[in-house]
A protein has these predicted regions:
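Active-site-proximal, substrate-binding regions of enzyme catalytic domains
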Residues: 1-91, 98, 106-109, 132, ...
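Mid-chain, well-packed structural core segment of small domains
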Residues: 95-115, 123
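Hydrophobic alpha-helical interaction segments
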Residues: 113-156
């Protein structure tokens, strides 16, 4: 089971590859705050219509709000709720933002990111190359550290 933050879902939707996320994860849980960030924040985010049609993405409420309240305030509401939901469900967390990754790891949650999804997609034969997908994500404003990309591409044989 995987809980997702907003960023990875939206970037896969923006580049028209939301189905790739499904092929790798099977299904995703999102907390209420992530749903709100995607659909209600000053109008829907780009890619929201694709997400709305994705029946494999399930909205779930966090039960123990005290977990959310104890999260660092530098994290966005979606990140805090995603961490709390992953903790409640004993699930992996799909998130790319470094502060959220650290906070989740501090809670004992296994963290995966967009690049891990691409690695798995390549390993399973769903994509041939990760590099053009990463470039497309970057062209849509999604940021990865340059050294992280170079290291990742080396690991997946595209360096």
């Amino acid at each position: 089971m995987i809980v997702s933050d907003t960023g990875p879902i939206v970037v896969f939707a923006r580049i028209g590859r939301l189905s790739l996320l499904r092929e790798v994860t099977g299904a995703l849980l999102i907390p209420d705050a992530v749903h709100t960030e995607i659909f209600a924040k000053k109008g829907a985010m780009p890619g929201a219509s694709e997400v709305a049609q994705a029946t494999w993405i399930q909205r779930v409420s966090v039960v123990d709000r005290s977990i959310v309240d104890r999260m660092p305030k530098v994290l966005h509401g979606g990140e805090r709720e995603a961490i709390a939901l992953a903790k409640e469900r004993g699930a992996q967390l799909l998130v790319d933002e470094i502060r959220a990754r650290r906070a989740a790891s501090d809670q004992g949650i296994e963290v995966i990111g967009t690049l891990r999804v691409l690695d798995e997609a390549k390993r399973l034969g769903h994509i041939g190359l990760a590099r053009p997908i990463i470039a497309h994500m970057q062209s849509q404003g999604y940021r990865f550290e340059r050294t992280l990309i170079l290291s990742f591409l080396e690991i997946v044989g595209e360096g």
